[in-house]
Swiss-Prot record:
Source organism of the structure: Escherichia coli (strain K12)
Listed name of the protein: NADH-quinone oxidoreductase subunit C/D
Record keyword Cell wall biogenesis/degradation present: no
Keyword entries, A-Z: Cell inner membrane, Cell membrane, Cytoplasm, Membrane, Multifunctional enzyme, NAD, Quinone, Translocase, Transport, Ubiquinone
Membrane-topology descriptor: Peripheral membrane protein
Length: 596
């Protein structure tokens, strides 16, 4: 059985037949009931028959150490894929990524579908958070989930024609007819946005009173972005609500099919635009698995250092805007002063501020500049005192506590059902942080703690955990400063680094290869890889499929904010509108992370 913390190369292609869950599945369903796919994802990948899907899912959910979280669910257009040796015939496929917290292990189930029969039973009967994932898969691929409670578009407008992630759907604006907004089209779009309660199983009233339906957003300041929630109200009490997303959708996964492996890096920064280099980490690690690259120790520590700087930067904005949502304004200005110091440090190292696009496949863009250690030392001396002032001045305030303690509270069972990760999950008492549970980029070499709550995740607990996470990030940065390894800032690998000049003078073919890789992009081996990380807002992951080309065949981006917004109705029903504002502030999301 593979130890997830073992120091074997992360890029090995494995079928994971030694994983206990494979034996458990074979004992229950027979040795020939499914096909095991060898990949570089680091998890067992099992192709099962459509008719077995719900039975297998239920079996995994009821094991002694169960697979309790549906981490991700999406699809792939397999029609143009050439490297499918040993896999079931498929025009399309749907994958289900499940996590067992007790085992600290995952499994990925795949179902093959024919183009003339794109139907699969809904997974919502087992995992309620499958709802949005199935809607997105239908929206972007046209795969129907039989029995889904309300299968309708979620990313694209309701009037949209076609399914954008299909391979025969255009990927460039120049392939479309020029856009025209006529009065008739404008009226049609406005009508499509009109909320009809009956479509969502809501009643307009009872025998004695009518409910009010209120649009919060998509331009409300407390919605934290282009985000609409339709509220069903009885007075100020929220009877039910419907989150409406997609206004910020930019087709990030489709772009991954039209960019080279290197040129997609700047797009990762903008998936969650506050995270900076944190967003680059899972992508470059996943590509390095495909390429078979092991990076130098110096690269690992530099990446951790930049990631923790951006984690602090994001948490400061989150904490201060949460306080602002509750009613206090001053901490926002204090936080922006502190964030400016981080941006100055990031700019000195990378040359950029919010979106450095600085990590590279195999390393980083360039080495650390002279004086980086002095700037980091100054910040580490400055920040702890400021953090203490935030707690004393605002977070211990009795009014803030009264507005946030016990609000939008849920337990571990609810968190797992809705795919909640990050501070929201840890507040329920579940100690699961990817940096500790499944260390990447050398996190296993750092001494830090994971703050965990007492069993109930409410608004106040989520914020206070982030404050403690800030302190732990400062501990990590202190270790980066004191223990920065010597060595190269990039791996010596032909898929990512130009060959040394002395080699090119002796072997011209190395220069030819370099020319092709710079002009067209490196050709990655045909395989699949996966990498999850502990991002600023929860678990972020990239699932990449290479067909032996200069571009990704399929880029799946799983973000924490998408799952967290789906949970809103379950957590806020029966509360007041004012509680919803506090709850939204406690989630920590940006709409670019939700909509991609």
């Amino acid at each position: 059985m593979t130890d997830l913390t073992a120091q074997e190369p992360a890029w090995q292609t494995r079928d994971h037949l030694d994983d206990p869950v494979i034996g458990e599945l074979r004992n229950r369903f027979g040795p020939d009931a499914f096909t095991v796919q060898a990949t570089r994802t680091g998890v067992p990948v099992v192709w099962i028959k459509r008719e077995q899907l719900l039975e297998v899912g239920d079996f995994l959910k009821k094991l002694p150490k169960p697979y309790v979280m549906l981490f991700d669910l999406h699809g792939m257009d397999e029609r143009l894929r050439t490297h499918r040796e040993g896999l079931p015939a498929a025009d399309f496929s749907v994958f289900y990524h499940l996590i067992s917290i007790d085992r600290n292990r995952d499994i990925m189930l795949k179902v093959a579908l024919a183009e003339n029969d794109l139907h699969v039973p809904t997974f919502t009967k087992l995992f309620p958070n499958a709802n949005w994932y199935e809607r997105e898969t239908w929206d972007l691929f046209g795969i129907t989930f039989d029995g889904h409670p309300n299968l309708r578009r979620i990313m694209m407008p309701q009037t949209w024609k076609g399914h954008p992630l299909r391979k025969d759907y255009p990927a460039r604006a120049t392939e479309f007819s020029p856009f025209e907004l006529t009065k008739a089209k404008q009226d049609l779009e406005m009508e499509a946005l009109t909320f009809k309660p009956e479509e969502w199983g809501m009643k307009r009233g009872t025998e004695n009173e009518d409910f009010m339906f209120l649009n919060l957003g998509p331009n409300h300041p407390s919605a934290h972005g282009a985000f609409r929630i339709v509220l069903q109200l009885d007075g100020e009490e929220i009877v039910d609500c419907v989150p409406d997303i997609g206004y910020h959708h930019r087709g990030a996964e489709k772009m991954g099919e039209r960019q080279s492996w290197h040129s997609y890096i700047p797009y990762t920064d903008r998936i969650e635009y506050l995270g900076g280099c944190v967003n680059e980490m899972p992508y470059v690690l996943a590509v390095e698995k495909l390429a078979g690259i092991t990076v130098p120790d110096r690269v690992n520590v530099i990446r951790v250092m930049l990631s923790e700087l951006f984690r602090i930067n994001s948490h400061l904005l989150y904490i201060s805007t949460f306080i602002q949502d509750v009613g206090a304004m001053t901490p926002v200005f204090f936080a922006f002063t502190d964030r400016q110091k981080i941006y100055d440090l990031v700019e000195a190292i990378t040359g950029f501020r919010m979106h450095p696009a600085w990590f590279r496949i195999g390393g980083v863009a360039h080495d650390l500049p002279r004086g980086w250690d002095r700037l980091l030392r100054e910040f580490l001396d400055w920040m702890p005192k400021r953090l203490a002032s935030y707690e004393k001045a605002a977070l211990q305030n009795t009014i803030l506590k009264g507005r946030s303690q016990g609000v939008a509270a849920y337990g571990a069972k609810e968190a797992l059902e809705w795919g909640t990760t990050g501070a929201g999950l840890r507040a329920t008492g579940i100690d699961f942080d990817v940096r500790k549970a499944r260390p990447y980029s050398g996190y296993e070499n750092f001494d830090f703690e994971i703050p965990v709550g007492g069993g109930v995740s409410d608004c106040y607990t989520r914020v206070m955990l982030k404050v403690e996470e800030l302190r732990q990030s400062l501990r990590i940065l202190e270790q980066c400063l004191n223990n920065m390894p010597e060595g190269p800032f990039k791996a010596d690998h032909p898929l990512t680094t130009p060959p040394p000049k002395e080699r090119t003078l002796q072997h011209i073919e190395t220069l030819i290869t370099h020319f092709l890789q710079v002009s067209w992009g490196p050709v990655m081996p045909a395989n699949e890889s996966f990498q999850m990380i502990e991002a600023t807002k929860g678990i972020n992951s990239y699932y990449l499929t290479s067909d032996g080309s200069t571009m990704s065949y399929r880029t799946r981006v799983r973000t924490p904010s998408f799952a967290h917004l789906q949970q809103i109705p379950a957590a806020i029903r029966g509360s007041l509108v004012s509680d919803l504002i506090v709850y939204l502030g406690s989630i920590d999301f940006v709409m670019s992370d939700v909509d991609r």
